[in-house]
Amino acid sequence: MKKLVPALALLSLFYCKEKPQQEQKVPVQKVTAEAPQAEVIKDAVYTEFKPEIIRNVNIKGFDVGHAFSIEGYKIASGNYKPVDGNITLPDTEEDWGNRLLLLNDNNQITYQSKGFGEAYLYEPYFYKNRQNDNIIIVCQQAFEYFFGGEAFLFEKGKMKYLGNLDIEPNNMEIKLTDILKIKESKDGITFTFDSDSLVLQPGSKDRVIKNNNVKYVYDHQSLKLHQ
């Protein structure tokens, strides 16, 4: 009986030992990263500005009406001079008259628009998007009356023709570029007009309309009238 006492005591000590605490596992919450959203261009307003005017620009065979310096480039409007009253190259019977030229710092022509034909006025006006530094150029056209303007996009040293804004305010004292508002979004470039009434196809059909949110929209492919 005495031999059982030490054995019982050892057994008691064995069970009285503190049980090791099990590590508590905290459930890990899986966090799914959100897919990066595409950058959305908020409506950016193009504001008119006046670039540096260049005097005495010499372009062989070209009669310069207006010339400007922008970001190291020259932008000039005018027309190639006829020889003895005849159309000569680079003009052709289908491509002559007032046009826009882009020249690099070596005075080389890197872009020329298609000739618009005859006009007393073909004057560039400049509008800049401060978000991306793109520039819209609208060449105001006129005979004895104003008759719209051609729109171009100047982006990173490249020129692109957008289309013809065949519209004017219904007031012969002011012109297209006096009422023009330009805005850009991810959907394209919108041209609107600060005038109660407008004339479509001025100089030809002269169709007078109310300005019920009339606009031209360039949708990255073509320039279209919405009315």
Say what each PLM segment does:
Residues V83, Q141-Y145, S197-Q201:
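Short glycine/acidic-enriched loop and turn motifs that connect beta-strands
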Residues K17-H66, F154-N164, N171-Q227:
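Acidic, small-residue rich beta-repeat scaffolds with periodic aromatic anchors
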Residues Q22-Y120:
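Terminal domain-start segments
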Residues L4-L13:
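Sec-dependent N-terminal signal peptides
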Residues M1-L4, E18:
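Positively charged n-region of N-terminal signal peptides that target proteins for export
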Residues L89-G97, F143-F147, D206-N211:
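Short, solvent-exposed loop/turn segments at conserved positions within beta-propeller repeat blades
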Residues Q131-N134, V138-K175:
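Short helix-loop boundary/capping segments
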